[in-house]
Regions:
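Conserved D-loop-proximal element of ABC-family nucleotide-binding domains
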Residues: 153-154
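Phosphate-coordinating catalytic segments in nucleotide- and nucleic-acid-processing enzymes
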Residues: 1-140, 205-242
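Walker B catalytic acidic pair
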Residues: 146-148
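Walker B motif beta-strand of ABC-family P-loop ATPases
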Residues: 142-144
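Short, contiguous clusters of charged residues that form electrostatic/catalytic patches at enzyme active sites
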Residues: 123-126, 158, 162
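C-terminal lobe/lid and adjacent interdomain/linker elements of RecA-like ASCE P-loop ATPase modules
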Residues: 159-242
Length: 242
């Protein structure tokens, strides 16, 4: 698919080529975008407010709320789904519930908590739990996640990386945008030798045009501001010690 637009292009007016072929191939595809900012705590009556024009929100926020509201499938979880949920329980044992358009987190036998009373990092993990539990994320689906590491306790980054690797292995295509060294390296460490994980770096050349670089290993990226900053910190730390 090809798309052409400029700063003057109005919404939905971009020039698109080969759209029909693309739509036919992707007609049965389930995809979800998780923004860097957690939104479920603000879900109450948001759809109605947007439709009435009282507030303006990016459509991606409305999409993720709609995906999270999908009823949790009845019956026994599949073996793959059980594996995912077991990993997430290392971070949070709570389960997501929806009541009167409000999201709650119910930790074990404790009383349910409104989402806005829960730490933002745990809200993001709870959202992931919900998307796995209700079948939004399963084999053949696509996940776009902007800065998964944001507001996550650093000690849980390895758990998050392990879950992403498992989802990828089971057939979920994942696109992650990150500025975090630890998440990038843990994904590299935990992946298998036959993994299809690739690292992509977007940068501007001398003409200020956006270029793309792809590598199988994180440190093989020539345009890698994450590694550059990490090395700079290491040199400065050594300088302080010496």
């Amino acid at each position: 698919i090809g798309m052409t637009f400029s700063t003057k292009t109005k919404k939905w007016d971009a020039e698109i080529t080969t759209e029909e072929k693309w739509e036919k191939q992707m007609s049965d595809l389930t995809s979800v975008f998780i923004p860097a900012k957690e939104i479920l705590s603000n879900a109450w009556n948001l759809d109605a407010a947007v439709k009435m024009g009282n507030v303006e929100f990016d459509d991606t926020y409305l999409d993720i709320i709609a995906a999270a509201k999908i009823d949790i499938s009845r019956g026994v979880d599949s073996a793959a789904r059980k594996k995912y949920l077991k990993i997430l329980q290392q971070i949070s044992s709570g389960k997501v519930t929806l009541h009167e358009d409000r999201f709650y987190l119910k930790p074990g036998t404790q009383a349910k908590l409104e989402f806005n009373l829960v730490a933002e990092g745990l809200r993001k993990i709870a959202l992931l739990w919900q998307l796995i539990k209700n079948g939004t994320l399963e084999k053949g689906s696509v996940l776009f996640w902007d800065e998964p590491e944001a507001n996550i306790n650093p000690k849980y980054i390895p758990v998050l990386a392990e879950l992403l690797i498992m989802l990828e292995k089971e057939g979920v295509q994942i696109f992650v945008s990150t500025h975090d060294y630890f998440l990038s390296k843990y994904i590299e460490i935990k992946r298998k030798s036959d993994s299809n994980v690739q690292y992509i770096s977007l940068y501007k050349d001398e003409m200020s045009k956006v270029q793309c670089e792809i590598a199988k290993e994180f440190e093989l990226l020539e345009h890698n501001t994450i590694m550059d900053t990490f090395r700079q910190l290491y040199r400065e730390e050594i300088g302080v010690v010496l």
